[in-house]
Amino acid sequence: MAKQSRPIASLTLSFGLVAIPVKLYSATLPSERISFHLLRQKDGSRVKEQYVAVADGKLVERSEMVKGYEFAKGKYVMFSAGEIKALEDEHSTAIDIGEFVPLESVDPVYFGSTYYLAPDKGGAKPYALLTMTLQKTRQCAVGRWVSRGKEHIVVVRPLEDGLAMHQLHFQAEVRPFKDLGIGRVKVSDAELKLAGQLVDHLKAKGFDPGEYVDEYKGRVQAAIKDKIKGHAVS
């Protein structure tokens, strides 16, 4: 982890009578996404987005807006910012662990955002003890965490000499694969053998993320440099 990294939050990893102070870090680096702005072609002037009321075509300021849920065609119930705020989960600095399960029992399809957990002041020894225990037992911790007013399911697992935390999707958010309706197809032993040979030909010892780079991003960056120099992009 880079020395200049700053924790997102200070939390407590708790289960039973155990409470481990931890610092939460994002596992991904700040996005270096290339952003394009919308301009007027004739003079390069920036354009801005405005909101217009469908009923009368008049401009609507943000201060005049509320959120609404469409419960029937063209019919809405409105919620103020205060009403929505009141529905949020109570703020908590705890990651409440409810159970320990084999890591392989958690399907990767449920994985969302990933974070790193580091020991906070006074938490080094229990943090190390939990890490080593999870490594030895090949288990992961499943719990709940409230972030930005919403409760999330999380999995805490050992990673190298520390802990990583994955935010999970709720079951209702994941489309069952069986809904695709993929039927069974008969294949011969010869076809299966040939497919196995193709896999063996491309088989590697393990996944190396360094082997893959964002080539599209590289092309866009090169094109931007050419444009700045006044060159045409073909």
Outline where the language-model segments fall.
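Boundary segments of small protein-protein interaction reader/adaptor domains
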Residues: 1-234
